[in-house]
């Protein structure tokens, strides 16, 4: 049945996705109504979900994720897989498209609107980046709806607070694809990892010393050291396209300012609208644009695909 249904799509699942699809089919065949797929970042989780939905063939589908740019890219992925056979709509702060076959919603928007939907409104529900599923907004959505099948997607089921994500999905993990296996199977790009000793910063500071730690990291002396390391390890003859992860907005602003002495920099946070973020991602990857280092706070930790990046 799966092979027959897949023939209806111009885009085909890769080898690893086909293994996951077979296992999801098997779990449903034995009566399981929930499952969690663990798959390395960038290995094709969204396409996997779209292929499984194509095989399941729901009348109505709900896709939940926490971030707007991920939401729109997920919608586009489903449109590519389904073609014109299903209508797709957004349900977030900017749009409330409720009549479409498939709805793509942020957790916050859907949590605030549950009373507008019947409990059995959706046959198939997908929770993307589902390590967030222990949060109240997600739990309200999961506890409210009664789909025929609930699928969770994540790159890691482990949380710093040790709350159990797997239990939410009935302790069912039909498929796992860890980082090493994804690289071996050419699903994600291999990378060179450099551990660099930094003697200018006291990393032994406790949480209460966070401001002091950020000040040390952002000093001109330390930024000069970072500049030296970037130049030592960057891709020779190529435009630098680097992402830098920061603790908070103050940290990002200070790093962008100080490394701005050497590179064209910018910083983004949750305060930037989706359109602003996408423009920055495009500028970073564009050979004809000046942007070389993009500093980010919280928004690039998961679910964003920026294939042109050559340094983190």
Predicted regions and their residues:
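Conserved pre-motif I regulatory segment
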Residues: 2-36
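Conserved interdomain linker/interface between the two RecA-like ATPase lobes of SF2 helicase motors
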Residues: 173-243
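A short beta-strand element within the Helicase C-terminal
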Residues: 122-123, 292-296, 300-312
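Conserved helicase ATPase core of P-loop NTP-dependent helicases/translocases
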Residues: 72, 87-98, 243, 253-254, ...
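Post-DEXD/H (motif II) to motif III coupling segment of the RecA-like Helicase ATP-binding lobe
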Residues: 131-193
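Walker A/P-loop
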Residues: 30-53, 245, 295
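Conserved Walker A/P-loop ATP-binding site and its immediately adjacent core
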Residues: 48, 55-80, 247-250
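Conserved helix/coil segment N-terminal to the catalytic DExD/H
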Residues: 93-124, 135-140
């Amino acid at each position: 049945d799966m092979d027959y249904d897949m023939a209806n799509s111009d885009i085909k699942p890769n080898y690893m996705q086909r293994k996951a699809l077979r296992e999801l089919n098997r779990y449903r065949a034995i009566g399981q109504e929930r499952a969690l797929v663990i798959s390395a970042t960038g290995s094709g989780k969204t396409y996997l979900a779209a292929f499984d939905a194509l095989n399941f063939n729901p009348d109505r589908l709900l896709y939940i994720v926490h971030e707007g740019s991920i939401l729109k890219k997920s919608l586009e992925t489903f449109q590519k897989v389904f073609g014109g056979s299903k209508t797709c709509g957004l349900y977030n702060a900017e749009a409330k498209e409720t009549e479409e076959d498939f709805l793509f919603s942020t957790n916050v928007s859907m949590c605030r609107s549950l009373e507008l939907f019947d409990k059995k409104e959706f046959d198939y529900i997908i929770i993307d980046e589902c390590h967030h599923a222990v949060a109240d907004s997600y739990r309200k959505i999961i506890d409210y709806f009664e789909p025929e099948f609930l699928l969770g997607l994540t790159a890691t089921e482990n949380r710093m607070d040790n709350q159990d994500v797997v239990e939410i999905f009935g302790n069912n993990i039909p498929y796992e694809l860890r980082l090493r296996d994804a690289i071996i199977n050419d699903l994600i790009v291999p990378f060179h990892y450099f551990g660099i000793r930094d003697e200018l910063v006291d990393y032994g500071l406790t949480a209460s010393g966070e401001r002091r730690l950020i000040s040390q990291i952002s000093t001109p002396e330390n930024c000069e050291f970072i500049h030296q390391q970037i130049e030592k390890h960057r891709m020779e003859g190529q435009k630098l396209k680097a992402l830098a992860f920061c603790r908070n907005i103050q940290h990002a602003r200070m790093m962008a300012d100080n490394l701005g002495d050497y590179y064209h920099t910018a910083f983004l946070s949750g305060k930037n609208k989706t359109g602003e973020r996408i423009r920055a991602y495009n500028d970073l990857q564009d050979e004809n644009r000046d942007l070389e280092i993009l500093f980010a706070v919280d928004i690039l930790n998961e679910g964003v695909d920026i294939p042109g990046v050559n340094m983190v």
